[in-house]
Amino acid sequence: MHAALSPLSQRFERIAVQPLTGVLGAEITGVDLREPLDDSTWNEILDAFHTYQVIYFPGQAITNEQHIAFSRRFGPVDPVPLLKSIEGYPEVQMIRREANESGRVIGDDWHTDSTFLDAPPAAVVMRAIDVPEHGGDTGFLSMYTAWETLSPTMQATIEGLNVVHSATRVFGSLYQAQNRRFSNTSVKVMDVDAGDRETVHPLVVTHPGSGRKGLYVNQVYCQRIEGMTDAESKPLLQFLYEHATRFDFTCRVRWKKDQVLVWDNLCTMHRAVPDYAGKFRYLTRTTVGGVRPAR
């Protein structure tokens, strides 16, 4: 068992918030993202973001400029290395798959974006341009809940550990050695050596906005626990992966045209659902720059 989110309080006066599950995710209405946001409305959006970790706004037919402007309310926009940008807007990157593409869908494993960087993204702001009537959902899970549901003994065991991250399985040497290649509509050709570069982050981090602790591991970018042998590290990481991805820690968002979604990249994992073969799907995203994760 784990604690569900508390019922909505009276603090939301400028926006309407409808939770998606008892763990994370909320729909926000009563706001027009095409217009500048006053401080009171923005503070409520930020409050909902820190509370629900994943928030989405239906029916927001925003332009690229408005997409960028809204994203900058969360912090500086800093595109990730792997994705192509749309013409004329380097800050806006594409998640696009043609109906006839047959390569692997990018992001189809549970992961946190770009943890191979020294300062991974803080948040991602994504909007749906053209999506299938059904299929192509995105799943999210709460790394707060994953941490909070560990036993006190396990928490004490892992809280001081660090994990080595790299992109070797995504565009480094391990990726080059496998056959499961991503389709190339959205993905840049990346330098293999850059993919093999390693960085180290704490296994448990404290969110600077909410003050809550969360696990910070994912099977896409994590290579090993620092200072352990593979025989010691692998089973512990595997346990944490399996624990974090429990179904009751998740939510699933169904995309609709003109929907804008923001996820907190420090305290969640997400994955694409590759169930829309033969259908065109096009979303754009901006990435909010982060700081080095810390305990």
Swiss-Prot record:
Gene Ontology BP term (one) = catabolic process
Similarity comment text for this entry = Belongs to the TfdA dioxygenase family.
Q: What does this protein do?
A: Involved in the degradation of the phenoxypropionate herbicides. It can also accept (RS)-4-chlorophenoxypropanoate, however it can only accept 2-oxoglutarate as oxygen acceptor.
Does the record carry tRNA processing as a key word?
A: no
Q: What is this protein called?
A: (R)-phenoxypropionate/alpha-ketoglutarate-dioxygenase
What organism is this sequence from?
Sphingobium herbicidovorans (strain ATCC 700291 / DSM 11019 / CCUG 56400 / KCTC 2939 / LMG 18315 / NBRC 16415 / MH)
- Needs which cofactor? Fe cation; L-ascorbate
User: What PANTHER family does this protein's entry cite?
Assistant: ALPHA-KETOGLUTARATE-DEPENDENT SULFONATE DIOXYGENASE
Name the positions where Fe cation binds.
111, 113, 270
Temperature dependence per UniProt: Optimum temperature is between 35 and 40 degrees Celsius.
Q: Name one GO molecular function term.
A: metal ion binding
Pfam family for this entry, one: TauD
Report the catalytic activity.
(R)-2-(4-chloro-2-methylphenoxy)propanoate + 2-oxoglutarate + O2 = 2-methyl-4-chlorophenol + pyruvate + succinate + CO2; (R)-(2,4-dichlorophenoxy)propanoate + 2-oxoglutarate + O2 = 2,4-dichlorophenol + pyruvate + succinate + CO2
Give the record's keywords alphabetically: Aromatic hydrocarbons catabolism, Dioxygenase, Iron, Metal-binding, Oxidoreductase
